[in-house]
């Protein structure tokens, strides 16, 4: 896959890439970022604002974030593909909100006390009906909304960049984390 690993002070770290904000903010959903924060370790973060994309349908430079990508969809594939993408994103947003509200390292689910459970439930309540989708393979959700080959290839690429696997073998929770950063690229 595309995971990164390194050793430091006797610890071994393995983490998939973060395509956008990743390690930069306190309270982020990057497991590596949270560990570094807990260990009070600072690492130099090099942000990039775009990347070159080589696809069967097109080759192009793309800035990070939702707006530049929406513009590129319209340019390359037209309004129908953009409508597909918007429907897909509308389905993914509640999953991304759920992921962004869940504590990754604070406690394990078995050890949540009553107050923590209540606080977590109130945060998740607006999107609770979507929680079951986090267990699905991401390809199942993507193919429900995306018929355009470019969009399917794009989501398959993003899945590979996160997990080293196809969208059908990638966990929806991992992709919801990526898309949470997609919605907030800075």
Q: At which residue positions do the language-model features occur?
A:
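N-terminal glycine-rich phosphate/pyrophosphate-binding loop and immediately adjacent elements
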Residues: 1-101
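Fold-independent oxyanion-binding glycine-rich loops
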Residues: 16, 158, 171-176
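Short, contiguous strand/loop micro-motifs
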Residues: 19, 125-126, 186
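Generic low-polarity alpha-helical segments
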Residues: 20, 43, 142, 172-175
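A short mid-domain helix/strand-loop element embedded in enzyme catalytic domains
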Residues: 28, 32, 169-175
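Rossmann-like flavin
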Residues: 56-170
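Helical element adjacent to the flavin cofactor pocket in flavoenzyme catalytic cores
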Residues: 175-186
């Amino acid at each position: 896959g595309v995971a990164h690993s390194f050793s430091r002070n006797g610890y071994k770290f393995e983490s998939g890439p973060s395509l956008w904000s990743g390690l930069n903010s306190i309270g982020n959903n990057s497991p590596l970022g949270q560990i570094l924060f807990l260990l009070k370790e600072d690492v130099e973060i090099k942000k990039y604002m775009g990347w070159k994309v080589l696809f069967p349908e097109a080759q192009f430079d793309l800035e990070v974030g939702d707006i530049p990508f929406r513009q590129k969809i319209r340019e390359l594939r037209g309004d129908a593909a953009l409508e597909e993408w918007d429907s897909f994103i509308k389905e993914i947003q509640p999953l991304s909100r759920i992921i962004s509200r869940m504590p990754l390292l604070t406690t394990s689910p078995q050890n949540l006390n009553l107050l923590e459970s209540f606080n977590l439930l109130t945060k998740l309540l607006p999107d609770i009906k979507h929680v079951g989708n986090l267990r699905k393979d991401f390809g199942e959700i993507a193919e429900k909304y995306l018929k355009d080959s470019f969009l399917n290839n794009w989501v398959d690429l993003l899945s590979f960049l996160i997990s080293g696997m196809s969208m059908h073998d990638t966990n929806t929770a991992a992709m919801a984390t990526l898309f949470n950063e997609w919605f907030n690229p800075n």
